[in-house]
């Protein structure tokens, strides 16, 4: 029995070592959504350095029942690219326009385009004055979100509380589960974060400057159905017309995937080329349509570092600034168009 106990304890020593390594090195150095999703210890220095450039306060107001009847010049509806707080494009736009912006959380399992239709049909927009409403949708979900819009849906509920509960539930995992996830992901098994080599340093990081980390779902374009593309484009036109019929100017912005923006700079790229945004070229002549890749790709090509965050799937404050300037131009054009 004693020998068995000694052998059992001995067998657990490697696990103890791994747990201690995770506690004292891996966990404290997780940063960015890609770092947390992929259990990659990027460290905190990069995020801390980037954070020193953020605006000091946010002028983005979250929609609640209490401010339903308030008047705002600009309203925004979007996914995680529209929930970036002080470093988000809305905050820079708010400062350029010198006005607060009202942001609507997208409904769980709904998406920004459908949430926008729900708000329009339920009369929420009729209670608030908007000069313009901006709908933002990330590229990897663009076709699905647009092609599945139900234009007859009138239900809307503020999803902020439920959303936070869902996020808390997803973020909370038993400690050992995190350890085993790190071991599994470190072995490359079913890792949702991909890594490729770039032809130059596109990020201000001594360790990962020439590496591109991106979300596996950035490759979801490989399964796009052509019929869904046709429906998506038709629905986008219909959404714009519906807002116009209510007297509301609309801007539809696509938040380009990180992989799409950097794919031309990957050495020996093992993945196919993403051409999703090519399907929407016929919309580029319209002032209501904003393809953020056209704004951000030239920055990367000209050597601007950290257009997107090295350790995150989202763009940085640098991109937010440039996107905000473009949105300001579009708002001016639309405001002077009958």
Describe each PLM feature range.
Residues 1-338:
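Extracellular glycan-modifying ectodomains
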């Amino acid at each position: 029995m004693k020998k068995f106990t000694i052998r059992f304890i001995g067998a657990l020593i490697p696990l103890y070592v791994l747990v201690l390594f995770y506690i004292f090195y891996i966990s404290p150095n997780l940063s960015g959504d890609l770092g947390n999703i992929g259990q990659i210890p990027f460290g905190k220095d990069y995020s801390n350095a980037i954070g020193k450039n953020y605006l000091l306060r946010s002028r983005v107001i979250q929609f609640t029942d209490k401010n339903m009847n308030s008047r705002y010049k600009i309203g925004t509806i979007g996914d995680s690219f529209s929930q970036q707080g002080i470093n988000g494009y809305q905050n820079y736009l708010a400062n350029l326009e010198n006005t607060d912006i009202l942001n609507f959380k997208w409904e769980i399992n709904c998406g920004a385009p459908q949430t926008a239709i729900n708000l329009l049909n339920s009369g929420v927009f009729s209670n608030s004055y908007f000069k313009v409403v901006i709908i933002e949708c990330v590229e990897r979900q663009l076709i699905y979100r647009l092609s599945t819009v139900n234009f007859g849906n009138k239900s809307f509920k503020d999803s902020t509380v439920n959303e936070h509960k869902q996020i808390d539930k997803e973020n909370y995992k038993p400690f050992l589960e995190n350890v085993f996830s790190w071991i599994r992901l470190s072995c490359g098994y079913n890792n949702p974060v991909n890594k490729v080599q770039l032809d130059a340093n596109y990020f201000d990081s001594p360790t990962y400057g020439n590496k591109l980390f991106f979300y596996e779902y950035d490759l979801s374009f490989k399964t796009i159905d052509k019929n869904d593309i046709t429906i998506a484009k038709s629905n986008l036109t219909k959404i714009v017309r519906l807002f116009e019929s209510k007297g509301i100017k609309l801007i539809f912005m696509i938040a380009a995937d990180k992989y799409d923006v950097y794919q031309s700079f990957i050495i020996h790229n093992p993945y196919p080329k993403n051409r999703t945004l090519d399907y929407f070229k016929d919309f580029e002549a319209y002032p209501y349509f904003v393809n953020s890749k056209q704004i951000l790709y030239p920055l990367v090509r000209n050597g601007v570092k950290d257009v997107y965050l090295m350790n995150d799937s989202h763009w940085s404050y640098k991109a937010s600034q440039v996107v905000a300037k473009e949105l300001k131009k579009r708002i001016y054009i639309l405001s002077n168009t009958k």
